[in-house]
A protein has these predicted regions:
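Short, basic-rich loop-to-helix N-cap that marks the start of a DNA-contacting helix
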Residues: 38-51
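Short alpha-helical DNA-recognition segment
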Residues: 15-33
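A short, Lys/Arg-rich alpha-helix, primarily the initiator
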Residues: 1-20
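Residue-level recognition of specific faces of alpha-helices
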Residues: 31-34, 45, 59
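The DNA-recognition helices of helix-turn-helix-type DNA-binding domains
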Residues: 28, 39, 64-67
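Alpha-helical residues within the helix-turn-helix
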Residues: 12, 23, 51
Length: 68
């Protein structure tokens, strides 16, 4: 399972809020909603967020192996 909980922490650390991502940087509200729910997002979107936040992927996402 991929979790994007670290995204919100990184945003705070970088001084960028939800409103700025959507208005200044053009990140769609639906993308942020999908991430908040833990749903699928494209690698393009992850790359875009890493560039905006000037961070690495591990700063916005974590992988946890699903229990079988």
């Amino acid at each position: 399972m991929i979790s994007y909980d670290k995204l919100w922490v990184t945003m705070e650390e970088k001084g960028i809020n939800y409103y700025q991502l959507t208005t200044k940087y053009g990140v769609s509200k639906s993308l942020l909603s999908r991430m908040k729910k833990g749903n699928w997002v494209s690698t393009h979107s992850l790359n875009m967020l890493c560039n905006i936040l000037d961070c690495n992927l591990e700063d916005i996402a974590t992988f946890t192996k699903d229990e079988q």
